[in-house]
């Protein structure tokens, strides 16, 4: 009698476990199809809640003119940043990308061409651009199993440009092992003929009242002396008590288990340094 009751209890417990596991898996799978589920911004803010933390990010490079000057400033202040690179620019300047990597900076994917009408035309074209950029990065770094895991949408995910198409693309990111991140403060350094002072004032305005800063800058052209505004920005934030961190630091603690899962799913090796 005791054996029968015990056996029934085990069966019931097993059924409960299966139901809970199946329900949790369904909820997780459903959430993974939502754009917000792969938005790293919320998680960065949550991790550093109550701290004054700044993340420097640079889009559209690498370039032979601006990137080395940006790297010189970062090295002088001992700051690691994130560079969201274009595959086309990587193909043109592989040596500069290698210098970024050797300097300890984190490399993110920004697509291949920065042509929104092509990048966001359909899900397959979107994935193809990201994977093409990854291959360019692998070739430049000579690391065959290098995998990016962080993407930044050209023009930003939250901008109204191609909004519905970007929603579709964002839902596809988890299937190729990616999350994305936008920004919450800018210098507008890519706007032509904007003075250094004006650019710095824009940064102060857009960063006001924020503890966690994801700062957007560019290392693609030499329009507005990005490296000068960068130095102004760094000094200003240091005086305000901010600590500079790299998104790779977040990647280390948050994505390690995702990398293992993704690697198993792909049946191959996933690289991270």
Language model regions located:
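C-terminal domain-boundary segment and adjacent tail
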Residues: 40-48, 76-78, 89-91, 222-273
